[in-house]
Amino acid sequence: MRFQLRKCSKCFQYTLKEICPKCKEQTISAHPAKFSPDDKYMRYRLAERYN
C-alpha cells in the first residue's frame, strides 16, 4: 500500500501531488512512521525531538 496524502511544509496544505499547487514547494508524506516496540533507534528520535 502506497501512502498518497502529502502535506506542504511551508503552507501546511494537504495535497496528493509531489509539488504544492499553492506555493510550488516540495511536499512530504502526511503519514507517521510505523510503530514497532523493537525499534532500535527510538532513543535517538526522542532525544532529537525533545532536546
Curated annotation (Swiss-Prot):
The biological processes this protein is annotated with in GO are:
pseudouridine synthesis; rRNA processing
Q: Name one GO molecular function term.
A: snoRNA binding
Indicate whether tRNA-binding appears among the record's keywords. Answer: no
Give the matching InterPro entries.
H/ACA_rnp_Nop10, H/ACA_rnp_Nop10_sf, Nop10_arc-typ
Alphabetical keyword list: Ribonucleoprotein, Ribosome biogenesis, rRNA processing
Cystine connections: none
Q: Which SUPFAM superfamilies match?
A: Nop10-like SnoRNP (SSF144210)
**HAMAP family noted in UniProt:** Nop10 (MF_00803)
What name is this protein filed under?
A: Ribosome biogenesis protein Nop10
List the source organism.
Answer: Nitrosopumilus maritimus (strain SCM1)
At the highest ranks, the source species' classification is:
Archaea, Nitrososphaerota, Nitrososphaeria, Nitrosopumilales, Nitrosopumilaceae
Q: Which gene encodes it?
A: nop10
